Amino acid sequence: MQVQRAITRNLAKANGYFNKTFKPPTVNYTVRGLKAGVAYLQQNQIRFNPILLQENGQAFIQQVIPHELAHILVFQQFGHVLPHGKEWQMMMEQVLGTSAEVYHTFNTQNVAGQQFAYICACQTHLLSIRLHNAILKNKRQYICKQCKQVLYYKDVLANYSNNTKK
């Protein structure tokens, strides 16, 4: 119920700002994994992660709902544009009155699934099973955004260093 109220409240802000009536999106709670929400523009639908909503309550309602609704509103107002481009940022800040944060910072321990430790020159990265499997199949390499080094699976390095010591 809080979700629908937040959508209605934010829609009213957009309707007033643009002096028009936006079509309200349908909502469901089928997102799994690390994502808090996803906007399906052509379907005019927003899907939310029920576990992250339950665990983060008010913060989720204040951050994620406007974020995903802004995608829908931008599509209805401007058509196809960059997902987090200037139109989306304007919609978030000027119309909905919230900060234009691209990523949530919720604790995802309960929704993360199995993770695999990879290392680079500066830190350890936890990758999902999907990314891990892509690396194992030699389809992908991932590079650290900070040190620009290729990520290596921690267990492979442990086995390699044990074998070289003999």
Curated annotation (Swiss-Prot):
Example of a GO cellular component annotation carried by this entry: cytoplasm
Chief localization: cytoplasm
A GO MF label: zinc ion binding
A single BP term in Gene Ontology: response to stress
Keyword presence, Metal-binding: yes
Cofactor-binding details, from the entry: Binds 1 zinc ion.
Active-site residues annotated for this sequence: E68
UniProtKB keywords: Cytoplasm, Metal-binding, Zinc
Named cofactor requirement(s): Zn(2+)
Domain named SprT-like: residues: 17-152
One of the Pfam families matching this protein, by short name: Zn_ribbon_SprT
Keyword Ion transport tagged: no
Annotated localization: Cytoplasm
Chain positions recorded as Zn(2+) binding sites: H67, H71
Family affiliation: Belongs to the SprT family.
Cited NCBIfam families: PRK04860.1
PANTHER family on file: PROTEIN SPRT
Name the UniProt record assigns to this protein: Protein SprT
Organism, scientific name: Haemophilus ducreyi (strain 35000HP / ATCC 700724)
Gene name of this polypeptide: sprT
